[in-house]
Amino acid sequence: MVPRGVTATAPGKCILFGEHAVVYGAPAVAVAIEQRMTVTLTPSTKWTVNGTPLHASKHPHIVSLMGHWGGAAALEPMDIAVSGELPPASGLGSSAALSAAFLRSLERLTDRPMTEDEAGRWAHLAEADAQQGRASPMDTSTSLLGGVVVVSNRNEGDLLHRYERSLDTSEGTLAWSIHSLAAYLKGVHLVIGNTGVHAPTAKQVQRVAERLARDPEQRQAIDAIAAITRRGLAALKSGDAEAVGHAMSENHIVLRSLGVSSEALERLIEAASPTSLGVKLTGAGGGGCMVALTRDPEATARAIESAGGTAMITAFGNPGAEASWTDA
């Protein structure tokens, strides 16, 4: 039996630019946030998760990742304690952070170091398994790598290329290039506002697809988001916080025109706007969260709370998944 335990943490994410348009080949930009998921493995006589038996239907990400190590039978039994600061089903990547943290904990436990590409592939496949075969690598890549991550359908030559990802689906093979961006915005924070309204990503993606099918001219909105994302990337590279904020607000206007905002999101966005450089929904929309770029995070957080949301303050440049030994 392993004499020591392992604790690993991994960050959630919020999307600054490109949601929905990324489905159609445009780039998208995500930021690793301060709020994290924590996984602690402690030697036990059987596999449990927070004291209850490990089960594939209840813990699909964990079971999928264990399969890459040969399954439960190939590993010493552990109690898996899962905790975190990321609300589930909110668009902040809680399941991806769980996958990234559990992967790093198994890597440390078994002393089997993985390459960056291997870690990205295994975490992405766990997300895809849990989502019945389709998942973007954005969430898992941001959780693993930390910082600012750019996902595109091509190699963005002026960014740091990390790895390629592909996934076979019923609609064909999907492919992505994963990059990191060194972004330094001084004196600003992100404030995330959670509406508390759950809106499944697949439903929102389907809603946009149906809108585009009914009115092909709406494709101009996708092209507009792609152009805004590229302007936002340029502003991030140059450290121009005002331009980043402006691009965020522009992005939201287009997303709203696609019908993926909601009354709850608009209420929080309106409340946060006076103290922010830019505001937008983050993620698939319909509910979930919004994000504000601000020089006065406390004031913005208070405004969000006063409007009925739950606020979380985060800085840029948060580290990716990491693990360490603990006393069992």
Predicted regions: what is each one?
Residues 33-35, 92-112, 116, 147:
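DPxDG-like acidic metal-binding loop motif
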Residues 71-90, 114, 118-125:
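Glycine- and acidic-rich phosphate- and metal-coordinating loops
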Residues 2-11, 15-17, 22-23, 30, ...:
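C-terminal nucleotide
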Residues 18-19, 82, 94:
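A secondary-structure boundary/capping signal
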Residues 287-289:
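Glycine-rich active-site/cofactor-binding loop and its immediate structural neighborhood
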Residues 26, 92-97, 117, 135, ...:
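Short, conserved micro-motifs enriched in small and acidic residues
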Residues 90-93, 280:
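Short helix-coil transition sites and intra-membrane helix breaks within transmembrane domains
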